[in-house]
């Protein structure tokens, strides 16, 4: 069978082959440590950024450990467990619905309780980032969470991957000289 992006993302992030659908797990559903997790353990700041949703297969493979890529809510719950410093993308696909289609508490207060500052749009990021220890940057309220708009469809104030990347580098280099790891998917 042809490799899907969750298996490919897991291979990129961990160096291990796995089954289609797996996020950060091997064929036996055991957790695989990603290069991003190793960087964090070594004292580096870590960021995961994407032009799609933050809980999508490739970015998730760097911070999450779930047996199925469709477990968007559960993948999002793995984000604060990883404890990385910066996450950014279009948004989150299922912020209040579990994989078994049950209503659940919104992920955003969970992120905030874990010490993350959530910024919706670049202007909000600029006003909040200086005081933030950990940051999540997503599209403005009401924007499509699945991906950033293509250039031809972009409106004033829409995030771009270039803005996300610049913001990530700026955030990850403030107050630290231990280096950083940044995954950018576009």
Language-model features: where?
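N-terminal catalytic scaffold of extracellular/periplasmic and nuclease hydrolases
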Residues: 1-129, 133-134
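Anion-binding catalytic surfaces of enzymes that hydrolyze or transfer phosphate/sulfate esters
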Residues: 123-186
């Amino acid at each position: 069978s042809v490799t899907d992006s969750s298996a490919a993302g897991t291979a990129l992030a961990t160096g291990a082959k796995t089954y289609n659908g797996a996020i950060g797990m091997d064929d036996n559903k055991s957790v695989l440590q990603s290069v991003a997790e190793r960087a964090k353990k070594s004292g580096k700041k870590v960021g995961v950024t994407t032009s799609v949703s933050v809980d999508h297969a490739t970015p998730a493979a760097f911070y999450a450990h779930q047996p199925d890529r469709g477990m968007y809510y559960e993948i999002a719950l793995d984000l604060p467990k990883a404890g990385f410093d910066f996450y950014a993308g279009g948004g989150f696909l299922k912020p209040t619905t579990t994989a078994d289609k049950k209503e659940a508490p919104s992920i955003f207060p969970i992120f905030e309780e874990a010490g993350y500052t959530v910024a919706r749009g670049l202007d909000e990021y600029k006003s909040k980032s200086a005081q933030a220890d950990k940051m999540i940057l997503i599209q403005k309220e009401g924007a499509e969470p699945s991906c950033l708009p293509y250039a031809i469809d972009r409106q004033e104030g829409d995030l771009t991957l270039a803005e996300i990347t610049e913001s990530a580098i700026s955030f990850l280099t403030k107050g630290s000289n231990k280096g950083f790891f940044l995954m950018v998917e576009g």
